[in-house]
Amino acid sequence: MALPTFTMRQLVEAGVHFGHNTRRWNPKMASYLFGIRNGIHIIDLQQSVPMLHRAMQAVRDVTAGGGRVLFVGTKHQASDVVAESAKRCGQYFVNHRWLGGMLTNWKTISNSIRRLRELDEQLASGALAGLTKKEQLVLSREKEKLDRALGGIKDMGGLPDILFIIDTNKEALAVQEANKLGIPVVAIIDSNCDPAGITYPIPGNDDAIRAIQTYCDLMSGAVLDGIQAEITRGGGDVGAAAEAPVEQIPEVVAEAAAEEAAAPQA
């Protein structure tokens, strides 16, 4: 396996080169713009291509070292694609709303994740059957709310090693928190964005669904290439890694080991 390949033609067909109306531009993006067409800024794909490849290499290197990648995209065009792409490569995502402190207050977020796991277990085991319908409804709604906010990171087990972000204006808080903690950020920067604070900027359209799908497909492919490299380096069976490995969470492993030890021996 190798890093996914792409061509400038593919980027053009996906609409990656279309920026926003010239009235909405950010002057800090001037060096990444090719020109203006019909009142729309055109992004310079001659720069986007190598910058996208560099970002993919960075993501690949993170997973090759056993690191975690967090996909972030909460706008409606990106939400489903971000979740699907992260799941496809065994990584993590935030696609509903970025909660303040999601990175910088990880201890509190971890407590909420622990609560979500408890509710998952209770619902799966039928432990709520003895409660009144009202009590069951309250707990079900609590679970849905937590799952919507934290379901994509409940198995992350710690802070991510790199973020991949669609729309830095929409996800400004995620960028700020990552910068504060020194976590690298890969991000799509449209003509109305501020590239400051982005470790691996990728000039491109952050609104068109086809463009978003293209970025996410390439990043998930880079993740999988890194995972495969890690497995190969460790002497594992690459052919057995068709399904991206899901990271084990220590408390879950400990619980499973305890159950196995308590089980009657055949």
Swiss-Prot record:
Homology family: Belongs to the universal ribosomal protein uS2 family.
Keyword set includes Ribosomal protein: yes
Ribosomal protein among keywords: yes
The entry's keywords: Ribonucleoprotein, Ribosomal protein
Family annotation (Pfam families): Ribosomal_S2 (PF00318)
Protein name: Small ribosomal subunit protein uS2
Organism: Paramagnetospirillum magneticum (strain ATCC 700264 / AMB-1) (Magnetospirillum magneticum)
InterPro entries with a match to the protein in the record: Ribosomal_uS2, Ribosomal_uS2_bac/mit/plastid, Ribosomal_uS2_CS, Ribosomal_uS2_flav_dom_sf
GO MF assignments: structural constituent of ribosome
HAMAP family, sorted: Ribosomal_uS2_B (MF_00291_B)
GO biological process, one term: translation
GO cellular component: cytosolic small ribosomal subunit
Lineage, uppermost ranks: Bacteria, Pseudomonadati, Pseudomonadota, Alphaproteobacteria, Rhodospirillales
